[in-house]
UniProtKB/Swiss-Prot annotation:
This is Protein YAE1. One of its GO terms (cellular component) is Yae1-Lto1 complex. Residues 35-75 are annotated as: deca-GX3 motif. The complex LTO1:YAE1 may function as a target specific adapter that probably recruits apo-RPLI1 to the cytosolic iron-sulfur protein assembly (CIA) complex machinery. May be required for biogenesis of the large ribosomal subunit and initiation of translation. Belongs to the YAE1 family. GO terms for molecular function: protein-macromolecule adaptor activity. The keyword Chaperone does not apply. May form a complex with LTO1. InterPro entries: Essential_protein_Yae1_N (IPR019191), Yae1-like (IPR038881).
């Protein structure tokens, strides 16, 4: 009668307990990997947000300045269409003041601050001021 109840009470073969152990090991591995991935993802999200929060003020000021420069040149170009130099400068400004040109790593220190004024923006501020002097004063 003891043989009849052996499998009910867990006194089965070695292979069954080995299979259970392998299943538990596999399940543990899956959970560990998932936990690791969750931790990495959460860390990336948190650091990405922190980087965005730190860099946004600088980026927004630069973006505003670029918009102001391009907008001024476009307005002047619309009124003074015969000025070929203005047209050429506008095309150059639109290339040089693209986001990927203005927001390059080399322009910023480790704290994401500019060391002084942005050289490309400074160049175009002077050019735009020249056109403002020529046409608006």
């Amino acid at each position: 009668m003891g043989d009849h109840f052996d499998d009910v009470w867990g006194s089965g073969s070695e292979n069954e307990s080995e299979g259970l152990t392998n299943d538990i090991k596999k399940l543990r591995e899956i959970h560990n990997n998932r936990g690791y991935l969750d931790g990495v993802t959460d860390s990336k999200d948190m650091n990405l947000q922190n980087g965005f929060d730190e860099g946004f003020p600088t980026g927004s000021v630069l973006g505003y300045t670029v918009g102001e420069l391009i907008g001024t040149m476009m307005s002047l170009n619309a009124v003074y269409v015969e000025d070929e130099q203005l047209k050429s400068d506008l095309e150059s400004a639109q290339k040089e003041l693209r986001v990927n040109e203005v927001l390059t790593k080399s322009m910023f220190n480790e704290q994401l601050d500019l060391d002084g004024e942005h050289p490309v923006l400074l160049k175009w501020k002077k050019i735009v001021e020249g056109y403002e002097e020529k046409y608006l004063k």
